Amino acid sequence: MAERGQQPPPAKRLCCRPGGGGGGGGSSGGGGGAGGGYSSACRPGPRAGGAAAAAACGGGAALGLLPPGKTQSPESLLDIAARRVAEKWPFQRVEERFERIPEPVQRRIVYWSFPRSEREICMYSSFNTGGGAAGGPGDDSGGGGGAGGGGGGGSSSSPAATSAAATSAAAAAAAAAAAAAAAAGAGAPSVGAAGAADGGDETRLPFRRGIALLESGCVDNVLQVGFHLSGTVTEPAIQSEPETVCNVAISFDRCKITSVTCSCGNKDIFYCAHVVALSLYRIRKPDQVKLHLPISETLFQMNRDQLQKFVQYLITVHHTEVLPTAQKLADEILSQNSEINQVHGAPDPTAGASIDDENCWHLDEEQVQEQVKLFLSQGGYHGSGKQLNLLFAKVREMLKMRDSNGARMLTLITEQFMADPRLSLWRQQGTAMTDKYRQLWDELGALWMCIVLNPHCKLEQKASWLKQLKKWNSVDVCPWEDGNHGSELPNLTNALPQGANANQDSSNRPHRTVFTRAIEACDLHWQDSHLQHIISSDLYTNYCYHDDTENSLFDSRGWPLWHEHVPTACARVDALRSHGYPREALRLAIAIVNTLRRQQQKQLEMFRTQKKELPHKNITSITNLEGWVGHPLDPVGTLFSSLMEACRIDDENLSGFSDFTENMGQCKSLEYQHLPAHKFLEEGESYLTLAVEVALIGLGQQRIMPDGLYTQEKVCRNEEQLISKLQEIELDDTLVKIFRKQAVFLLEAGPYSGLGEIIHRESVPMHTFAKYLFTSLLPHDAELAYKIALRAMRLLVLESTAPSGDLTRPHHIASVVPNRYPRWFTLSHIESQQCELASTMLTAAKGDVRRLETVLESIQKNIHSSSHIFKLAQDAFKIATLMDSLPDITLLKVSLELGLQVMRMTLSTLNWRRREMVRWLVTCATEVGVYALDSIMQTWFTLFTPTEATSIVATTVMSNSTIVRLHLDCHQQEKLASSARTLALQCAMKDPQNCALSALTLCEKDHIAFETAYQIVLDAATTGMSYTQLFTIARYMEHRGYPMRAYKLATLAMTHLNLSYNQDTHPAINDVLWACALSHSLGKNELAAIIPLVVKSVKCATVLSDILRRCTLTTPGMVGLHGRRNSGKLMSLDKAPLRQLLDATIGAYINTTHSRLTHISPRHYSEFIEFLSKARETFLMAHDGHIQFTQFIDNLKQIYKGKKKLMMLVRERFG
């Protein structure tokens, strides 16, 4: 026997924490075919190892494992005992328990100690095995591996029968494993060098590649020495790389692989393909593996000469590698005082586990940490979020297999998350983490909740987790539960009746982190006898129990209830599911749903009895301080998923899981009667109806909108996800009854319902949920559907006058959120959902006048966003004017009414879509008819600005396209034209600056109206109108053939104009030139009247000189529009009015010259000389202009003699 002592680190890998390892905790019935329990999703069959067990009992022929007519001997007692020992006991305990162990017994224990299920190999070599829906691992350790009941030393079974069974089962397992790898690989890329699959190529997954290597015959030299398996795996040559041979070594203990080594240098979380290939070779072909006892046993049988020869040959074969170590050990052994001589015996890496060794599967902690750190450093890019979610899924898979590495792996992940440098950076900058990153933290917290609620967790293990969680929780950068700031809600994760801490001072509460709920859950236990009865039996009832109090343990039918804070109770369900107890989770879920339904009925009764007193005193009570939808523990989603899974898993599959009470002790039956499980459901009900009903209960719950952007987005997201799942279910008559029942409750349950008559001002709106209810109920009960949808339309948080506190603030809610000002970060999304609900109702109500009127009234009352009402108006218009049917005039009127409301809402506010809205309204009114167009023009002042009314509304109404579209007769045209002219004049009176021109245009065909509009312009010209507007109207008048009116307006415009000396590019210059040209064309008198205005308003020399030259080129009145003629002589510059203009022009040049010289730079000298040249031309137009210009130049030379270079240029040019 191997001698054990204090072993040096290289001999043993002590890396596992204590925990409920799952590899050996299941059925003892199977040891059968290699992979006989391995399904296409890497899951065990109905009973792991069942095929092999049946074969061992003579049923092999029926199962196809043996040829017809062949039978197999029963499994030997030696193999049965050896298999159980190999699963449960470390080999050291066997050695210590028995003084001598016969060699055949040792061989069978060593034989059965290797894992026999491929499921674990698959789990540790790929991200996702597809086994998430499978149950616990209790059936894995005995199934899927090993060869029936024999094969290999010491067996008394028939070799031929054993070989046949193993070969057939191996073939089946190979096909199943290939299918499982394909299912697992699709869309689930691995990480690291071993299996990065960006495109979802399953052939690159380590497990799939390992199968391929095995099937290709690439595994050789397989040798099992004790609890150590070794072999070589040949990697075939590919185009870029030559063939390589990898040396693989595997240590195992109690049906778990405890360490792996491969020369391929793989750096990954999971086992490489070579380890997979060698492991599957041992599982599928155990009779082809050379089996030896631990090396210490072999050495024990050698005498001194043999031992010396053995050591010398070993050193000779590997002298370059082991000689230094051999010499060092020899020196230590020969030294009497060396440490090695103080220890009895010597280590043996092939001798199996010691008593103190932890029994868990090999997990490379360093690689887990490195990979998580890498994913976090990528900051959400390159699919890192998806990879981390896959790691979380792997943790859940391990938990379901009851593998202690689940908690161990999550600890490693959490440590890396806590070490993320971005946490402190975000905290310092006061910025929120990204939404995807925040969701990863949520999943982290939820997984810890599952782990600490493990129903079979040891107290010392839970204490260790609690210590670690508190350590993380105390770190400053630990993320808060709500994503933004600490929750103001009290500690609700407890097993006590809720509301006990409702009045706790929120200011004194510490912030709740993502670990707070897991820390609180450490105080929960599973020892409650009522709870154990619920989860351990389908037959737990009490018909003698008639206590109808709120917290009674049974309802009136004798069915068990579970009164606990709902999210906490649902966390128990999630924990049971996560740890592989689906039957127990289902039992508790049913009890919780029945409790919720009973509470719901009592709430309805209570509200009905108190309804009359409600307006007078505050008597309502909200029993849920936290909403269940969007809750960190996702209670509704957990119940829904558990019940929906039960719809897909039949009783036979559920019965395959180990008995939950195996480690908890049997419960006493006492006086309880027994009832079949299906009696816990009403007649006609099923798990599906329960799932749907609990989803409706959760979605319809009245709940306060939480604080913070993230939590509010989470509420919306979770609601939409749950509704999306509901939409996948096809409604039948049974489900419709559930919908009706819940819809009635929602309408009548008052403050307990989010659709009750009275709700809190800050309650989460029901728009999304109501839209789903509406569409679901509409074909079956339209009246109820509309009641639900219309009730849900309200959005009280936007109401300017909130209802009184007595009606809307039940005392529990008021104590938690006292008068805080709501910050609804998701308000835009909520309003969009409100709009979607309204649009759905409008579409459904097409053709129903009464319902359309009701929906319209609701929209006008409850929707406060003009853009959303405009969208609804457009939607209604599109529905009403579909191409394949006649227009729906009622829906068109609804569309028009909504459009009118939009106009009123946006009339006094800025809206960038306003012009689009006005144009659309006119189009809509046109579709409705001529009376609608006339109506909007009659009431234009409540709908439009004067500018919109004249430039868009009236203009469009008067257009030819409108007349043609409506097929108007002369009388109708005149009526519309009269309304348009009236509108135009009213707008011109109210806003002449912007509407005068439009008014004149609209009134052209009516002389009286046109004169009225012109008079309005004249009256406004002296007060509010600008020269630009007056010039525009003046040009219009000239164009229409009214030159004198144009002249009048031009003179009025000139009085408002002021052009300084340097504004030689002013946009009004063309208007001034046009006005002067108009005056010149009308005659000398008109020109004489306008020139003083020009001189007064224009100081720019170039503009004045331009006007002067134009006036001297032609005779005034020669091109007069009225045909009158003046004398053919040109006007003299020495006489008025041109003399005044000439003097003003010369003066402007003088002033401009001095202004320019004040700030002139050398680069502008040449430009200045050209300017003086133009000035000289103007000077010379006067009879003494030469003298004036000479004096002007001399004066410049004297004043600016300091500018020598400039003056030199002046002298050169002008003397």
From Swiss-Prot:
PROSITE patterns documented for this protein: ZF_SWIM (PS50966)
InterPro entries per UniProt: Znf_SWIM (IPR007527), ZSWIM4-8_C (IPR048370)
Highest taxon of the lineage: Eukaryota
Record key words, sorted: Disease variant, Dwarfism, Intellectual disability, Metal-binding, Neurogenesis, Zinc, Zinc-finger
Stretches assigned to coiled coil: none
Any one of the GO BP annotations: striatal medium spiny neuron differentiation
SWIM-type zinc finger span: 246-283
Record-level GO cellular component terms: Cul2-RING ubiquitin ligase complex
Pfam family, one: ZSWIM4-8_C
Region (Disordered): 1-46, 133-161
Gly residues bias spans: 18-38, 133-155
GO molecular function: zinc ion binding
Annotated disease: Acromelic frontonasal dysostosis: A rare variant form of frontonasal dysplasia, an array of abnormalities affecting the eyes, forehead and nose and linked to midfacial dysraphia. The clinical picture is highly variable. Major findings include true ocular hypertelorism, broadening of the nasal root, median facial cleft affecting the nose and/or upper lip and palate, unilateral or bilateral clefting of the alae nasi, lack of formation of the nasal tip, anterior cranium bifidum occultum, a V-shaped or widow's peak frontal hairline.
The protein's role, per its UniProt record: involved in nervous system development, important for striatal morphology and motor regulation.
Protein name as it appears in the record: Zinc finger SWIM domain-containing protein 6
Organism: Homo sapiens (Human)
